[in-house]
Amino acid sequence: MSFNSIFMKNQKYKLLAAATLVALAFFRLIPHPPNFTPILAISVFAGIKFKDNLFSYLVPVSAMLVSDAIIGFHSGMIIIYLAIVLSAFIARKFNTINTSVVSSCTLFFLITNFQVWIMSSSYPKSLSGILECYTLAIPFFGMTLLSTFFFSYILFYGYAFLTSIKLYHKI
């Protein structure tokens, strides 16, 4: 393999990552139903498709940073970013779309709502308080699961389509 072909392959890889970042940032900025975003789908896609471990974690986190710079940051962002990195890690381990989506969404639900319970004064710091927090978050979990499946299949089938046509190989 020549240097030129290796360089071009890396360029395609970077182009795919950049397009993914732009798409994610765009979808987080437009009005959408609560928790109906492509962030976990991007994380699952990056975990399965990007061979470089660090890159598969940096792509979804970078996209979040870009869109959060516009939307605004809050005190619990580090936990959300950690949950996103863990989603990519899960996808790398399972390497199947459906299992990765369900596992990532469940982990994201458990981590982020535990954070809500810990940081919020809305719930008593007791077993009943954490159960109430998780119970009230169930509708959001449904939207997270639905959007992650929806966007995951768009990403994976879009990638399969793009890599199957000759035009992609000339980019």
Language-model segments: residues:
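Mature catalytic domains of secreted/periplasmic carbohydrate-active enzymes
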Residues: 3, 11, 49-54, 59-62, ...
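Central hydrophobic cores of alpha-helical transmembrane segments
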Residues: 20-21, 56-67, 99-109, 171
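Structural signal for the C-terminal ends of transmembrane alpha-helices
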Residues: 26-27, 46-51, 89-95, 158-166
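Interfacial aromatic-anchored transmembrane helix boundaries in multi-pass membrane proteins
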Residues: 26-37, 61-93
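Membrane-embedded alpha-helical hairpins and interfacial helices in multi-pass inner-membrane proteins
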Residues: 97-171
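Alpha-helical transmembrane segments of multi-pass membrane proteins
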Residues: 20, 40-44, 80-88, 149-152
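Hydrophobic transmembrane alpha-helices
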Residues: 2-48, 55
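Hydrophobic alpha-helical transmembrane segments
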Residues: 14-19, 54-58, 78-82, 98-103, ...
